[in-house]
Amino acid sequence: MVLGADKGFQGAMPYSHDILTAMIGMLPPQSIFCVSAIGPAQLPATTQAILLGGHVRVGLEDNNYYSKGQLATNEQLVARTVRIIKELNLEPASPNEARDMLGLKHPARMAG
């Protein structure tokens, strides 16, 4: 689910708590879902998705700011999301766990 792109894409959905809750409510039981939100919607949408058992995508592709007027780095955006996950007594997926969830092959180990 991508939310918050309504200013740039015709037919896109804005982010609101109610919209995300409704979209998740329409999924089949036991669905695995991921939420990505654009711009200022990124922090509230990803936090809500985590609380509702979803997966998230964060980074500069979707949001250039850490807070109002403060440019972000990918590292800052990822670190904040990891902090939120851990504050909720959850554990973020490792790169290999994420690959497994997505059905991706693990990179070849380098010799040496």
Where are these regions (language model features)?
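Short beta-alpha connecting loops at secondary-structure transitions
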Residues: 65-67
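Catalytic alpha/beta core domains of metabolic enzymes, predominantly
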Residues: 1-61, 71-72, 76, 91
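Mid-to-C-terminal alpha-helical segments outside catalytic/metal-binding sites
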Residues: 83-112
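Phosphate-binding loop/pocket of nucleotide- and phosphate-handling active sites
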Residues: 78-81
